[in-house]
């Protein structure tokens, strides 16, 4: 069986390793970054490191005779997931989604919003805002909140892009997920009274950001996940692997 694993996330690497252990499976792994692609080399027969539009995805599926597509992209990679669902339907192949569990936390100082524009408009009232939601929506947030009021934590690979938006002293370049304590100290050190984050789930360090902010006495604005009606969806990796193993029989 030939399987395409759309990844670039921590979860996708764990899924890939467990799929490899099933044996008798050709794994094609896709990631939008070189770093994500290197992680895929541990378990995949073939790695593609570039964003694929709908037509490119279709051609890749045809070229490698893919039987099943496992979408383990980030919960906010909505266009990639929509394209994958449509292409699988057109080509009549199985689409399976893995998505981290949502972690709704109820607290008077936590506000849930639908998108980053709403988040930025709410954050505009703050004295200083810590943007903990990656590079993609940083410019929009800065444009609305104000350049002098935003601190942004980004991946080291995104620093050059961030420097086009903010001065160096307002950029924190770090890789990984971080403890509640580290998040708390960063928020305090930069005197931020609001953070913007997104519901990225357990492996995205969501709880550690939220509780770190609350302990630093900062308000938390959380951008909710986009809602997609997935044909088949798992939030447990072992259950996903069992499902695919049964398809192989």
UniProtKB/Swiss-Prot annotation:
Enzyme class, UniProt record, top EC level: oxidoreductase
Listed EC numbers: 1.3.1.106
Catalyses which reaction(s): Co-precorrin-6B + NAD(+) = Co-precorrin-6A + NADH + H(+)
Keywords of the record: Cobalamin biosynthesis, NAD, Oxidoreductase
Keyword Transcription regulation: no
Zinc-finger listed as a keyword: no
GO BP terms: cobalamin biosynthetic process
Family label: Belongs to the precorrin-6x reductase family.
Task performed by this protein: Catalyzes the reduction of the macrocycle of cobalt-precorrin-6A to cobalt-precorrin-6B.
Protein name stated in the entry: Cobalt-precorrin-6A reductase
Organism: Methanocaldococcus jannaschii (strain ATCC 43067 / DSM 2661 / JAL-1 / JCM 10045 / NBRC 100440) (Methanococcus jannaschii)
């Amino acid at each position: 069986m030939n399987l395409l694993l759309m990844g670039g996330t921590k979860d996708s690497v764990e899924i890939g390793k467990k799929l490899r252990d099933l044996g008798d499976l050709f794994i094609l792994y896709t990631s939008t970054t070189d770093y994500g692609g290197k992680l895929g080399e541990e378990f995949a027969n073939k790695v593609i490191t570039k964003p694929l539009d709908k037509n490119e995805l279709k051609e890749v599926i045809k070229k490698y005779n893919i039987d099943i597509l496992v979408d383990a992209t980030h919960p906010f990679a909505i266009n990639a997931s929509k394209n994958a669902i449509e292409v699988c339907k057109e080509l009549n192949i199985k689409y399976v989604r893995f998505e981290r569990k949502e972690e709704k936390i109820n607290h008077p100082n936590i506000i849930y919003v639908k998108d980053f524009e709403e988040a930025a408009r709410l954050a505009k009232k703050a004295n200083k805002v810590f943007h903990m939601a990656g590079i993609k929506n940083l410019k929009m947030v800065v444009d609305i909140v104000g350049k002098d009021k935003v601190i942004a934590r980004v991946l080291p690979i995104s620093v050059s892009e961030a420097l086009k938006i903010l001065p160096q002293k307002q950029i924190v370049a770090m890789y990984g997920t971080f403890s509640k304590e580290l998040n708390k100290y960063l928020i305090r050190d930069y005197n931020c009274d609001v953070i913007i984050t997104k519901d990225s789930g357990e492996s995205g360090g969501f709880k550690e950001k939220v509780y770190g902010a609350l302990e630093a006495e900062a308000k938390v604005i959380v951008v909710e996940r986009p809602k997609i009606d997935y044909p088949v969806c798992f939030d447990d990796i072992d259950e996903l692997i069992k499902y695919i193993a049964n398809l192989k029989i």
